[in-house]
A protein has these predicted regions:
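N-terminal auxiliary segments of SAM/dcSAM-dependent transferases
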Residues: 2-39
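Conserved SAM-binding loop and adjacent beta-strand
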Residues: 36-44, 51-68, 85, 217
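C-terminal alpha-helical "lid/dimerization" subdomain adjacent to the S-adenosyl-L-methionine
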Residues: 49-60, 185-249
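Conserved alpha-helix/loop element of class I SAM-dependent methyltransferases that forms part
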Residues: 55-79, 89-97
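Class I SAM-dependent methyltransferase SAM/SAH-binding core
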Residues: 79-141
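A short acidic, Gly/Pro-enriched loop at the edge of an enzyme's catalytic core
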Residues: 138-153
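A short SAM/SAH-binding and catalytic strip from SAM-dependent methyltransferases
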Residues: 151-165
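A short glycine-rich, Lys/Arg-flanked "PGG" loop and its adjoining helix->strand segment in the class I
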Residues: 166-178
Length: 259
């Protein structure tokens, strides 16, 4: 007999405890290497999340791979904008689509991720195809990218943690060619507003960003994407098996720009 579905509501507490468990080792490492960072909350938080994500990033990717891998492999083509690739957890997926992809621009403004991202690009055999753009999504014009020059935009658990996500979505839409595809796998606000989770999610979200590098699990990102422009086809769905007891639900699928 399986566990009650309601226990899924407790999953965020388990994940928060995983993150919290990295606080002691972060303090210890900073005492040895950079004690001054202990005096800055932002510096400490950055180091803390970095230590935690060095483990949990791989776990998160493994858990989502069965969903994300076929989504990417089936829908990317031509010139791709990979928004917020971080240290490159998903870069290897583009290697499997090398026959369809001509260029991938990894839009990653955080220089601390670039070394790891380059290593993963080279390991995936994508050197010369995957190019890092060290700017924010709203500054793509500064590196020469033109409107309607991109065939595919990819956002994989990125819009939950970036500042000004609604503005970023609106600024990216013009770069997509007519008939181009926006591929999505993002945390979103629960649709079960009147159930317990509708109150539980915003409560958890009071502390979630602190423990998860600024990630906001209650953004209506799917709604913002729908409103970003004129779409010919919108095929977004909930994560596999997600329902009224999931505090960290997802929206995944594609949006095709009207021709």
């Amino acid at each position: 007999m399986g566990l009650p579905a309601q226990l899924t509501l407790l999953r965020p507490l388990l994940l928060l405890s995983y993150s919290a468990s990295y606080i002691p080792i972060t303090i210890f490492r900073l005492l040895i290497s950079s004690p001054s960072k202990l005096l800055s909350w932002s510096s400490f938080q950055h180091a803390w999340f970095g230590n935690f994500w060095s483990w949990f990033g791989g776990v998160s990717r493994q858990n989502a791979n069965a969903t994300v891998a076929p989504l990417v492999r089936s829908n990317v083509s031509g010139v791709v904008l990979d928004i917020g690739p971080g240290s490159g957890e998903w870069v290897n997926l583009y290697a499997a689509t090398a026959n369809k992809v001509t260029k991938v621009y990894g839009v990653e403004p955080n220089p601390e991720h670039h070394a790891a991202l380059r290593r993963r690009v080279e390991a995936a055999g994508l050197k010369g195809i995957y190019e890092i753009l060290p700017v924010g999504a709203q500054d793509l014009g500064s590196v020469g990218l033109e409107f309607e020059s991109v065939d595919t935009i990819v956002t994989l658990q990125t819009l939950c943690s970036c500042p000004g996500p609604q503005d970023i979505i609106k600024s990216l839409y013009p770069y997509l060619k007519k008939g181009g595809t926006w591929l999505v796998y993002e945390h979103v606000k629960t649709k079960y507003h009147n159930d317990f989770v509708g109150y539980w999610q915003p409560f958890v979200n009071l502390i979630w960003p602190t423990f998860f590098g600024g990630c906001d699990i209650a953004r209506p990102t799917d709604e913002w994407l729908r409103e970003a422009g004129d779409w010919e086809e919108v095929s977004l769905r909930a994560g596999e098996g997600e329902g009224p007891y999931d505090t960290i639900p997802h929206s995944l699928g594609t949006l095709v720009k009207r021709k």
